[in-house]
Amino acid sequence: MPLRLEIKRKFAQRSERVKSVDLHPTEPWILSSLYSGSVCIWDYQSQTMVKSFEVSELPVRSAKFISRKQWVVAGADDMFIRVYNYNTMDKVKVFEAHTDYIRCVAVHPTLPYVLSSSDDMLIKLWDWDKGWMCTQIFEGHSHYVMQVTFNPKDTNTFASASLDRTTKIWSLGSPDPNFTLDGHQKGVNCVDYFTGGDRPYLITGSDDSTAKVWDYQTKSCVQTLEGHTHNISAVCFHPELPIIITGSEDGTVRIWHSTTYRLENTLNYGLERVWAVGYMKGSRRMVIGYDEGTIMIKMGREVPVASMDTSGKIIWAKHNEIQTVNIKTVGAGFEVTDGERLPLAVKELGSCDLYPQSLKHNPNGRFVVVCGDGEFIIYTALAWRNRSFGSALEFVWSSEGEYAIRESTSRIKIFSKSFQEKKTIRPTFSAERIFGGILLAMCSSDFICFYDWADCRLIRRIDVNVKNLYWADSGDLVAIASDTSFYILKYNRDVVASYLESGKPVDEEGVEDAFELLHEVNERVRTGIWVGDCFIYNNSSWRLNYCVGGEVTTMYHLDRPMYLLGYLANQSRVYLIDKEFNVMGYTLLLSLIEYKTLVMRGDIERANDILPSIPKAQYNNVAHFLESRGMLEEALEIATDADYRFDLAVQLGKLEVAKAIAMEAQSESKWKQLGELAMSTGKLDMAEECLVQAKDLSGLLLLYSSLGDAEGIEKLASQAKEHGKNNVAFLCLFMLGKLEDCIQLLIDSNRIPEAALMARSYLPSKVSEIVAIWRNDLSKVNPKAAESLADPSEYPNLFEDWQVALTVEKNVASRRVHYPPADEYLNHAEKSDMTLVEAFKRMQVIEDEETEDALDENGEPDEEVLEENKVEESTDEAVEVDADEPEETVLVNGKEGEEQWVLTEHE
């Protein structure tokens, strides 16, 4: 059966002919050497070029990373080897290495060595710790040496491929080859070693269009791979998967099974001839160099093949080797930190006859099934003995220990606990996946059908695209994961049982009330498990979350991809594994889960009984959960964080509680927030106290001015000046009618022009004094401008109604400190737009007219007219402008002002 490897193209870049490729071990970089003479570094994540080196005008046939030195080493047709620092772009070394084209360079994995091979039929060893001295020359080939590669299992030996049709094995320190592998009909272009520990193999590719697998211990050809129609230019054993990759000048890349040597897949990206293949240990990425560019593919999933039983025993598969660890072996003396790799002792359990692609314990942990290559094998978990096997595309366990296999899209078989076949189901649709658990589920591309295990009766069809399915241990809840979200459903088993017992027919949709949708969460689930009624999962952003009652809580932000293994209740820890088989644990309290579950069920009394068992450090977590359920009062009682308790108290309108928290915290922001809330609720005394504590002078100005509190405004003016809040201080002084202090504040703030203009409008008698100050200050910067300033006392003709303004100032000076009560505002509002100077002049005109009317024909006073005037005077109101109303606009000497005055008739 085929491996069914998922192959995805991750990077594609057109360029000149690519002669070699390499992957960086830590950075997301691809190194390509081009026939045009340059070397490029591409970032396959951002799909951009990171670096480019112009090496030579002739082809660069080989380039490799030396990551431990931050170098790139390249060999070209100009016979020189060049070394560059890929961080600084500096050229580290240039030296002539051969007398003909350099075909290949290979870097020793640990020692400071580089091998080079050439058309001069020589292989040379270079030591960069000795200034790139040539420390050894290997002679023996009779034609071009096309490639050299170190043996990863014995780095003291290496292999070379030559157009003399041979492959030779060499040892460092010996000038002669250990032995020669001869079997190809034409020249050998490429060679690579098998990286696994179980087979001493290497592979070669030749111009005879074949690739040969060799056992270098017996020196025999194990297998010949035929299928390409042109020269094979690149070969490799994949370091992680049981496959062989061959690339040819026929434009195809062929993927072969490394055990059965069956052709699994053929790739053709239409970029003409294949020249190079690159890989990296620990990664499933492969990079391919073509005539017209570079392609990177990713094969299979990087999810580790591992399973944990309920006691903490973990079994995993590394290639065909099966290993086991036990979490309980971590001693009590070891302090376990969340996210820290556990120091687990790995034991070899055995090997597997097929390449494992999935591995899963049965519910009681006694058996383990391994699936792969279209087959399954059931082993005992302790002794790793084979109990059953067969062909299957998929295998699932039931909650009772039975199992089902999917042989094809149209046939599913069910087996008993004793491994005996019970039933065969032929679904009426194409079953692309099956899932186990309480019910047997089969899904197509856009729906899923649930069946009971006993009689295979349809329970329910649900129209949803399913990627995975997770049953709770209780069997009452199930999570259905799709591409973008997951759904929590309740399984009503009693409803189903009563319906089936009634004998009513089941239609193609199943039992209508079998499932009840409880929650939908818009997050993609990568892996998930149930703990009681709590669903734990990691999402597409690799955050470890849990969901109780539809409320999602993030436990931890994972720094790399990790996959859930299980939960141990006695340790209150959830365990995960990464692709390197490192196991980490994270704390998740069972009492916390139980508490949230009871709250969701409305059983508050039992939830409160559990609360004392939850550590105080988790109380804020509990409070946030209660807040999300709308239980703010309970959240406030439980929360321990001062900031959070303050926010809850504000939400509840409990100002006294919030005030007590603010007193402890002494936070200006809290006092300000509380002051605004107190003001909005009419608690003005508390608002004043809060604003004072917050030093919110603007807020106090609003409060005092609204209350008409002259004493408070006076104190605020002093505070504002002390704190340098001149705008607030000015407004306070202005509202108090302290014009001299306002002008002095402007002068002290170096706002002398504004002081002069204000004096012109409100205190004409002070203008001359301020102009002198202004002139003196301005003369330091612009003497001519200073001389042009006019003093009203010297040039009264330039200032309209100057004498009238001085007279008005004298008349109203005594009234500036009197504040009419607020309830008399309407009596003054109509006169708020009156200009004092104009009013004064008009009153003078009226007096003159009245004097003329009071004289008779002989110029003597007319007693009758005088008597009428007295009556009118007694009934007319005085022309008043309220000096304490800053909200209205008053025109003074034709200027806008904010002060209001009370005018009396001129006697």
From Swiss-Prot:
Keywords: Cytoplasm, Cytoplasmic vesicle, ER-Golgi transport, Golgi apparatus, Membrane, Protein transport, Repeat, Transport, WD repeat. It comes from the Eukaryota. InterPro entries: Beta-prop_COPA/B_2nd, Coatomer_complex_subunit, COPB2, G-protein_beta_WD-40_rep, TPR_COPA_B, WD40/YVTN_repeat-like_dom_sf, WD40_repeat_dom_sf, WD40_rpt. Residues 850-887 are annotated as: Disordered. GO terms for molecular function: structural molecule activity. The coatomer is a cytosolic protein complex that binds to dilysine motifs and reversibly associates with Golgi non-clathrin-coated vesicles, which further mediate biosynthetic protein transport from the ER, via the Golgi up to the trans Golgi network. Coatomer complex is required for budding from Golgi membranes, and is essential for the retrograde Golgi-to-ER transport of dilysine-tagged proteins. This is Coatomer subunit beta'-1. The lineage of its organism: Eukaryota, Viridiplantae, Streptophyta, Embryophyta, Tracheophyta.
